[in-house]
């Protein structure tokens, strides 16, 4: 029971912080309770703890609550020393600069993909997401790329046990069809989705390993623009893949 309570408290803390991000302004205890679907008494205890640790402060006017910059300082300290991003960031930035499209870096976490980095494109109309967002393996291009890194038997076993919900009318929901697609994509060296996760978005990706970690990197944008620039984008993506592989070789050679 104690373990379950600790997990619930951790989840509520994250919900509270995300509520402030969505509200973009101070919130009262009543507003917090409504937004995170939690009793006011529990919210009060949570806010008092965060206040004591310096993560939120209370405004005298209407007793509203807002996070301090301590959270930002902690997050920045963590981000500065990310074992993967600090090494990959320059290559990702160059990829976005050369294509103008949104660049995604992701890693498989059991039955889904988590975005480790998102560098939004420079176009007015672009694909948007955030680091920490999760996507299904079967309907995201990085999901497919990371599936492609697995041994065939291991991949088949994973696909057999995970759900394959239809996210859009274009989502591949047949297990055999998905496995066949992954096999073909792995053989040619790149992966794609066309409106499978978001109806009007296309993404192409490649996979690579660095420091023994399997990752996927993708370019994503509107289907029309991605199709028009497909050859150039894929060539640039393969260049980034080669740069990642060279970086990994330099680490292994030490």
What is each model feature region?
Residues 1-81, 85, 242, 246, ...:
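N-terminal helix-turn-helix
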Residues 6-10, 29, 64, 68, ...:
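Short, structured helix-loop boundary elements
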Residues 35, 46, 87-98, 104, ...:
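Amphipathic alpha-helical regulatory segments at dimerization interfaces
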Residues 56-58, 105-106, 208:
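A structural signal for short hydrophobic beta-strand segments in well-ordered beta-sheet cores
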Residues 62-161:
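Amphipathic alpha-helical effector-binding/dimerization core
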Residues 167-168, 199:
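Intrinsically disordered, low-complexity polar/acidic regions
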Residues 174-243:
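Extended hydrophobic
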């Amino acid at each position: 029971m104690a373990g379950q309570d600790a997990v619930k408290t951790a989840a509520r803390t994250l919900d509270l912080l995300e509520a402030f991000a969505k509200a973009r302004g101070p919130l009262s205890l009543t507003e917090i309770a409504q937004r995170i679907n939690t009793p006011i008494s529990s919210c009060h205890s949570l806010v008092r703890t965060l206040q004591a640790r310096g993560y939120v402060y209370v405004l005298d006017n209407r007793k509203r609550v807002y996070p301090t910059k301590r959270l930002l300082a902690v997050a920045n300290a963590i981000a500065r020393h990310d074992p993967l991003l600090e090494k990959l960031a320059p290559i990702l930035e160059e990829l976005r600069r050369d294509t103008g499209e949104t660049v995604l870096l992701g890693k498989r976490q059991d039955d889904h993909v988590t975005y480790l980095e998102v560098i939004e494109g420079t176009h007015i109309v672009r694909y948007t997401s955030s680091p920490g967002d999760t996507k299904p393996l079967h309907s995201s291009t990085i999901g497919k790329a990371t599936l492609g890194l697995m041994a065939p038997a291991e991949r088949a076993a994973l696909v057999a046990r995970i759900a394959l919900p239809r996210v859009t009318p274009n989502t591949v929901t047949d297990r055999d069809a998905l496995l066949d697609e992954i096999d073909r994509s792995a053989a040619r060296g790149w992966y794609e989705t066309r409106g499978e996760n978001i109806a009007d978005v296309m993404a192409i990706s490649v996979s690579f390993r660095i420091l023994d970690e399997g990752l996927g990197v993708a370019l994503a944008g509107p289907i029309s623009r991605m199709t028009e620039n497909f050859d150039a984008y894929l060539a640039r993506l393969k260049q980034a893949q080669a740069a990642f592989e060279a970086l990994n070789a330099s680490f292994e050679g030490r």
